[in-house]
């Protein structure tokens, strides 16, 4: 199922389709937003990855209750809006496609650093989260990601983080690892689109696309997604 306004998004020659079916999920998700992740190095903005976020259709009815009257600008500026996406009771799927080559260690250590920073700021960093971070780092330990390859995350409301890899932009049918830790599963997404998320462009895209979807007739009716 896809709505007319759910279109593909192209980020630096990487095209993310309107809908996908993640590995090991029976559900089809819609493309909620996408954008580049980069860093300002000296006087140049260096783009490292293209990030996209897909959501289960149930997300629309859940999020619209609080946010359907807000403008794109209001959503973009609201930390709570993105927090509701991160913690909402629906599945999420994220794809990170390389623009620049990265090693698994480079990628995973930066994500882990961001996750730990989030937990420490909230005072919720425990031994359980430290163990989950160790598992996360070990999944990426010996991997390399050339341009065009992808890392894929599926976040389940029950607290599992499923990790998959692809040599290109396609969605694999098999998974590489599953880590059972709710805080980690949410923190990986929060590190992308949360208060200090690494991709402001993806946040802007999410706010714009969801703002328009909320206003489409019937889109936020849970019965229309069955």
Curated annotation (Swiss-Prot):
Pathway: Secondary metabolite biosynthesis; flavonoid biosynthesis. InterPro entries: CFI (IPR044164), Chalcone_isomerase (IPR016087), Chalcone_isomerase_3-sand (IPR016088), Chalcone_isomerase_bundle_sf (IPR016089), Chalcone_isomerase_sf (IPR036298). This is Chalcone--flavanone isomerase 2-A. Its EC number is 5.5.1.6. The gene is CHI2-A. Keywords: Flavonoid biosynthesis, Isomerase. The record marks 107 as: Important for catalytic activity. One of its GO terms (biological process) is flavonoid biosynthetic process. GO terms for molecular function: chalcone isomerase activity. Catalyzes the intramolecular cyclization of bicyclic chalcones into tricyclic (S)-flavanones. Responsible for the isomerization of 4,2',4',6'-tetrahydroxychalcone (also termed chalcone) into naringenin.
